[in-house]
Amino acid sequence: MKRTGFGFWVLTLCLCLLGCGHLSKDKVILQRSFYNTLWERFDYVNNDIEIMASTTYDLSMRISFTDDYPYNDFSMIFTVFDDKGNPYRSKAYKFNLKDEEGHWNIEKKDDCYTFTLPINKQLTISDPGKYQFRIEQKQPITPLVGVKELVLMNDN
């Protein structure tokens, strides 16, 4: 009996630890892993989301780079399109990833540099409908080398 109780607690602890560090599906707006860490210029990362009632998003982006990434910064455009295909919100971003000497601004972990970057705090979509969330990379050379994964998250 004692052994069964101990096993139950060990199993419960393992399941809790496995769940830590992973995003729940309802927090992920869009996600893409890049084959061979290459991202073509007009290969948009997007996802359609059905909005049923007024919703507020607190958006951030987790993006991972490899040593092959050639730039000190990352430029992108984040756009939300309404159900008619019209831009609802759009903004260009430029994030500094490395210092002037080319050293990363974050420690390397699991063979990549992973940044969590603020995108849009308190984005409110009032009208119901199908909306498309899109991220477009704006770096000058294509394909962009060294991007491993991108995740747009709702932190609410």
Predicted regions and their residues:
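Solvent-exposed strand-loop boundary residues in beta-sheet-rich modules
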Residues: 82-86
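Short beta-strand-plus-loop segments that form exposed binding edges in beta-rich domains
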Residues: 62-64, 135-140
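C-terminal motif of bacterial Sec signal peptides marking the signal peptidase cleavage site
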Residues: 18-19
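Short tyrosine-centred short linear motifs in exposed loops/low-complexity segments
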Residues: 53-57, 117-131, 135-137
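Start-of-domain marker
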Residues: 24-76, 89
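An anionic, turn-rich surface loop/hairpin at beta-sheet edges
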Residues: 92-124
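Edge beta-strands of jelly-roll/beta-sandwich modules across compartments, strongly enriched
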Residues: 141-152
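Bacterial N-terminal signal peptides that target proteins for export
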Residues: 1-9
